[in-house]
């Protein structure tokens, strides 16, 4: 099953002919992703990477039947690109762009309400269902088809969890990078809900970080959920000082809230297994699944 994307997913790229769009589309095609075209305004009618280029998302969807889009567009224009994809009713939209103004994302968040679109990101590595479909910037070769669902606010820590679960032979069902911005499209609760309902996903790894209350919300959801699966969590930023932004725009302890200890406490009370070192994520999951 997996979640969000599979081998049947038809993907277009917004910002297709730019350097980032070109490079990562080449990587996706090489991985086996079903890329069906791309969008660059003003370049419609041309071909790029042997795929058709369209002026608008509406046109691309009408001609290709695309149901997913990946966005490699500079921050000043990225929100408009997301809004265009929402307007075209693209089912899964993955926005990689970092640095989109918060007010722009507030407008996007409003447009998502009641829409047919699921937004992943922005400021994220993307989504991958190993061996089937790769949408984003993650290195494909470290992934292996398997049974662990991974959801993370951090890109590089996602790769760490992936490499470790591959190394211990567990593999991944789907990996979702939800992004490190304060306003994003899909949160931990959304992903954990999908993983809990997915037959192929036997256990979940959740990687959080300081700032906001997304992890606390996830802990409450896990506590209330009737479906139970083993969950391992790592929270980055245990030693982070209050008031200092740590890399991501959303990674800041403010107003006395959002500390790693608060999040760890909430998750532990929900029955989640905690690891305090990113080096132990895979081993912790392996041991949890093989105990007694």
Curated annotation (Swiss-Prot):
Substrate binds at residue 159. CoA binds at residues 17-20, 43, 96-98. GO terms for molecular function: nucleotide binding; succinate-CoA ligase (ADP-forming) activity; succinate-CoA ligase (GDP-forming) activity. Coiled coil: none annotated. Its EC number is 6.2.1.5. It catalyses: succinate + ATP + CoA = succinyl-CoA + ADP + phosphate; GTP + succinate + CoA = succinyl-CoA + GDP + phosphate. The active site is at residue 248. Heterotetramer of two alpha and two beta subunits. HAMAP family: Succ_CoA_alpha (MF_01988). This is Succinate--CoA ligase [ADP-forming] subunit alpha. The lineage of its organism: Bacteria, Pseudomonadati, Pseudomonadota, Alphaproteobacteria, Rickettsiales. The gene is sucD.
């Amino acid at each position: 099953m997996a979640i969000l994307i599979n081998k049947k997913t038809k993907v277009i790229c917004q910002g297709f002919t730019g350097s980032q769009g070109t490079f990562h589309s080449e990587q996706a095609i090489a991985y086996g992703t079903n890329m069906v075209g791309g969008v660059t305004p003003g370049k419609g009618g041309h071909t790029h990477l042997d795929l058709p280029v369209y002026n608008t998302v509406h046109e691309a969807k009408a001609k290709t039947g695309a149901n997913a889009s990946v966005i490699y567009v500079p921050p000043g224009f990225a929100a408009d690109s997301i809004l265009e994809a929402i307007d075209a009713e693209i089912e899964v939209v993955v926005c990689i762009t970092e640095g989109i103004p918060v007010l722009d994302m507030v407008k996007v968040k409003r447009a998502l309400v009641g829409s047919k679109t699921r937004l992943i990101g922005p400021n994220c590595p993307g989504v991958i269902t190993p061996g089937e479909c790769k949408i984003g910037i993650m290195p494909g070769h470290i992934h292996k088809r398997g049974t662990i669902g991974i959801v993370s606010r951090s890109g590089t820590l996602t790769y760490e969890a992936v490499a470790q679960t591959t190394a211990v032979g567990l593999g991944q069902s789907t990996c979702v990078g939800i992004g490190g911005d304060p306003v994003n499209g899909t949160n931990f609760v959304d992903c954990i809900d999908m993983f809990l309902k997915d037959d192929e996903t036997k256990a979940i790894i959740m990687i959080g970080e300081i700032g906001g209350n997304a992890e606390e919300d996830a802990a409450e959801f896990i506590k209330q959920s009737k479906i139970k699966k083993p969950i391992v969590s790592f929270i980055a930023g245990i030693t982070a000082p209050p008031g200092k932004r740590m890399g991501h725009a959303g990674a800041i302890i403010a107003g006395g809230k959002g500390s790693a200890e608060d999040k760890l406490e909430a998750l532990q009370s929900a029955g989640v297994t905690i690891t305090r070192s990113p080096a132990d994520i895979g081993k912790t999951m392996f041991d949890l699944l093989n105990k007694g």
